[in-house]
Amino acid sequence: SPEKVQQALTNAYPQIATTLINEFSSDNIDDIGADNIYSNFLTRETAYWQPILEYNNVDGLQNIWDYHYKAIGQANAALDAIETTLHNDASLNPAKGEALVARAYAHFCLVNLFSQAYNPNTSSSDLGIPYITRPEEEMNPQRQRGTVAEVYQQIAADLEKGLTLIDDSYY
């Protein structure tokens, strides 16, 4: 139903922030951990490019990965419902657009955190992340990692298509 599509879209956004881990991976971190009131093992491991061994940290890498792919799964479930069950009902175009944009956003966050930064000279060979466009139908499927360039092309395609479908009538 359209209501269930909207409910799925409510969860199509990552329920975790990546700002902390991104900040620690930048050159903005202080040299002395005592100056950082949020200093902990994750902070030190990330700032000094050491393996991250603290597994129970809410903002840890595994949770960031999981929450973003859960959001992608919700966006894909909404898209699948619109395309199959609701037969591409035109009144749901704004919801379809939102799902495409939400999927692009989550992939954008992941490729920025888990892949090399986009470089036009190397992006066609740098490993990206799996770009998931369909709901999962099997447990733990093997996913192919495209290149960074391919991931950005898919992000751009989702954004371009999604933005043409979004309007204020749905909201």
Q: Which sequence ranges carry the predicted segments?
A:
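Acidic, glycine-rich segments characteristic of secretory precursors and extracytoplasmic regions
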Residues: 1-29
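Short alpha-helical hairpin
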Residues: 32-56, 131
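Secretory-pathway/luminal and periplasmic proteins that interact with or process carbohydrate-rich
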Residues: 17-23, 38-39, 106-118
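Acidic helix-start/capping segments at beta-turn-to-alpha-helix junctions
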Residues: 29-35, 95, 101-102, 132
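Inward-facing hydrophobic residues that define packing positions of alpha-helical scaffold repeats
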Residues: 72-75, 152, 159
